[in-house]
């Protein structure tokens, strides 16, 4: 997202960096190859995933790559992209490709944003900041996770000038919801992305088998521990700890390691935190309040009076839910099944997008995530009705393999393949992709 003041030169710079991304990326790789140099990360989706698995711990891999139940929704996401096939067009004279799009009256250098991924400290303690810098370098806005490992304000600063949006999980504490919204506004966020599909955690066997929830070790709660309202809640919990039965913890080496992790991820010095009840109380407060199973449309409708930011509802799969979202004031929806992490055997995000676009028509702003791995996937999503997409696991895989440079290269590769696919399909711009013929759907 480009800031609202003095934006034109910044936007032109970002758009210029993306223009010609395909051939420029190929050229850099092939020229480096003359000297025996190879990319930091594999350029194919399967190779990237395999490399990431080798670089991640078992717990990190389970959380990042795992899905709900038997993984049927994750499989459906990929199968739907395999099933839908572009029909290239010839001799359209596409000398240059324009990847720019407009969302909520703002210009963006490409139709790709980085999806929010929580608990990224599983991969690197500074994962949010490293990813934000990669996003800034590639001109791709980052949707900062509500379950991040660095405070919103620090990550937002690192993401400039590409900009950022902020993801909101609706807490059981309304004052905390308001506090997070105010911080998003103050940080210069381009939109507020309210995640609807995680009012409770889905059944995730990979994490459950390991008994691993990163938040219970203090990972992924930095937006909370940097929030004044939240820390008031923590201190209230400490004062009432005499009647709290959650103090019964079996003393084991793993428990000691978890307490050390809580201390390290809590603000302040680790030694002081080890002697303080705050880190553990912060974790327990989070586990009891971070999501709200009672979230309903009436509550969502209050957002129009609580923020001036564009409001995006993430996690929509049903056409009637999409219609209701816009009726209560959403500016856009993200068609998403949370990367297959919530309901096993649900509809794929791409198939849902087709139905929602057919139901609502061309006007509403629809974004898509879940299942996107390549630039070709982005092109298919745009051709089938998405106005933009959120890219998730691939950039995290790149981060795991080669840090900031790895995340940056993954983003560059996705943009490069998207731009080349546009050229080969005869599309001069993103709007032109909407007219590209796709076979494999009714």
Residue ranges and their predicted role:
Residues 11-105, 211, 215-220, 225-295, ...:
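An N-cap/entry alpha-helix motif that binds or orients negatively charged groups
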Residues 108-147:
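Glycine-rich active-site/cofactor-binding loop and its immediate structural neighborhood
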Residues 95-105, 130, 143-155:
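Short, charged beta->alpha transition segments
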Residues 164-172:
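A glycine-rich helix N-cap at a beta->alpha junction
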Residues 152-161, 184-185, 326-327:
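Acidic (Asp/Glu)-rich catalytic clusters
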Residues 426:
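Active-site-adjacent helical/loop segments in soluble small-molecule enzymes
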Residues 119, 133, 175-368, 376-393, ...:
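Alpha/beta enzyme core
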